[in-house]
Structures are given as structure tokens and as C-alpha cells.
Amino acid sequence: MHRIFKEFRVREIFVRVIFGVLLFSASAGAQGVPKTVFSEWKTKVDPAVERGLQFLARAQERNGSFPENYGTSTGIPSLVGMAFLSKGHMPTEGPYAGNINRCIDYVLQHQQRTGLFVAGHAGSGPMYAHNISPLFLSEVSGMVDPERQKRIAEALPRALNLI
């Protein structure tokens, strides 16, 4: 398979899985909508979301990144971490705690002195991935162990000053 096509295909799969998980997890808890609207889809959506999370967990590298060029940016691990969070998973417990923590550690490990979160293939430019990373870290702030919390508290102000 041609390398460019393969990279595009892997990126496309990741983006679809991440956004599918985020979309269905967020919509399942919508306020003011009768439960009957979602109940008929729940048996189809929940297993699909779980399969997506399992895929992301299996695909994650030991260092917290993901395969191919775009998976090494800070944006993809941040989006994947938010996908786990959107289904109610926590960095301190549960089947995906290790995956979430690897996402956190990867992002924190790739912050420059300027505050910029950048690693690997920047794709649309370094600010694209950078802007996703503080959103993820803001979401996990307060849910992590004290050491990670300290690192997040130090990293976020520097990151936000760039935006």
C-alpha cells in the first residue's frame, strides 16, 4: 500500500473513532430529551463507542503517542484522552486509566520552554495541536494524582499565554 495513502487512512480512522466516541458520549446525556429517544439507539451506540475506545487503547504506543506521523503530535493523544473522558473514564481508576495517563504524560513531556505543546508531525501547524492540548489538560486537572496535578498546574499557564 502506498505510504501516503496508508498515513491518510490511519489518520482518517483515528479522527472518525475519536469524534464518533465524543459525539455519541456527549449526546447520550443530553438534558431535557425523553429517555425513549436514546433508548432505542443505546444498544447499538454503546457497544460501538466501547469498540472505538478499545481500538484506541490497543493502538496507543507505550509512550502515549499513536501510530504514523499525526499520532506523534500532541493533538491526537489529547483528543484520544478526551474520548476516554467523554465516556466517563477517569485517569485514577478503570480499564482506561493507564491510557489516559499515558496521553497526559506524552502531552506534558512535549511542552517547550515557550509553553508550546509540539511533537511529531504538526499537520496543520503547531498551534492546531497546541490548542487541543490545554483543553485536554484542563479537563483532567483535578482528576489526577498529585504529581501529575503539579505538572499540569505548571504547564497550563504557559500554554494558555500562547493562545
Segment roles from a protein language model:
Residues F14-A26:
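Bacterial N-terminal signal peptides
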Residues H2-I4, A26-I163:
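Preference for long, amphipathic alpha-helical scaffolds in soluble/luminal domains
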Residues M1-E12:
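N-terminal secretory signal peptides that target proteins for export/translocation
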